[in-house]
A protein has these predicted regions:
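Internal nucleotide-binding/catalytic subdomain
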Residues: 1-87
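A broadly conserved detector of short glycine/acidic/proline-rich loop/turn motifs that flank catalytic sites
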Residues: 13, 81-82, 129-131, 165, ...
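Short beta-strand/turn micro-motifs at beta-sheet edges
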Residues: 20-22, 112-114, 166-173
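Short, flexible turn/loop "capping" segments at secondary-structure junctions
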Residues: 24-27, 117, 173-178
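Short, well-ordered beta-strand elements within core beta-sheets of diverse protein domains
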Residues: 33-36, 179-187
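Active-site "cap" helix and flanking loop/linker of ATP-utilizing ligase/carboxylase catalytic domains
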Residues: 45-64, 81-155
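Hydrophobic side chains in beta-strands
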Residues: 70, 126-128, 185
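Generic long, charged, amphipathic alpha-helical segments
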Residues: 138-184
Length: 187
């Protein structure tokens, strides 16, 4: 939201919250997401567009997201997020072709512009290790601390590091979260 209007196209994304495939395991903040970019549509007009006058009135500028459940009975908003989140921003970076500095500057400056994006879907997956999604420094130390992060090929396109350190030219897990990186791609 540039302070006056939502910048187009809008981002529509589908989050996967459970730790394991098949919607099983403990809930996490987000394990991965698929997304695409769209022009104004019924989902936008039923949710974000209705908030435009209030956001403008209060002088809000920035990212704004509404989580919803959509089914045969309608669109049901669950929560709003007024900040960039992880790994969503990393996946959006995969799809935005406008340079990020230019995008953020134009947004913060209140400019009327359109985000240049790739066609198709963007996907991101959180690469996790113990103790994620829990906080347990002892488990991290035992199972994950300094673990080597290996790529079959030396291609780091789509790799967004989080808790990683570089030791003698090798990526190793750092921190205590078990959240070393996010991998993104387009198709």
């Amino acid at each position: 939201f540039n302070g006056i209007d939502f910048v187009m196209p809008i981002n529509i994304n589908f989050e996967h919250k459970k730790l394991f495939p098949g919607n099983i395991g403990p809930s996490t903040g987000e394990m991965g997401t698929s997304m695409f970019w769209a022009k104004s549509n019924p989902l936008y007009r039923s949710t974000l567009e209705k908030l435009k006058p209030k956001l403008k009135e209060c002088g809000y500028v920035g990212y704004f997201d509404i989580n919803t459940i959509v089914n045969a009975k309608g669109i049901h908003p669950l929560e709003a997020t007024s900040r960039f989140g992880y790994p969503t921003i990393n996946i959006q970076m995969e799809g935005i072709t406008t340079p990020m500095g230019e995008f953020l500057y134009n947004l913060a400056s209140g400019k009327d512009f359109e985000i240049k994006t790739k066609r198709g879907f963007q996907v991101g997956v959180v690469i996790a290790a113990p103790p994620f999604p829990f906080k347990d420094p002892a488990s991290f130390k035992r199972y994950s601390e300094d673990a080597l992060i290996i790529f079959k090929k030396p291609n780091y396109d789509g790799a967004h590091i989080a808790d990683v350190k570089l030791v003698d030219g090798e990526w190793r897990m750092a921190g205590t979260s078990g959240y070393p990186l996010i991998m993104t791609g387009s198709g």
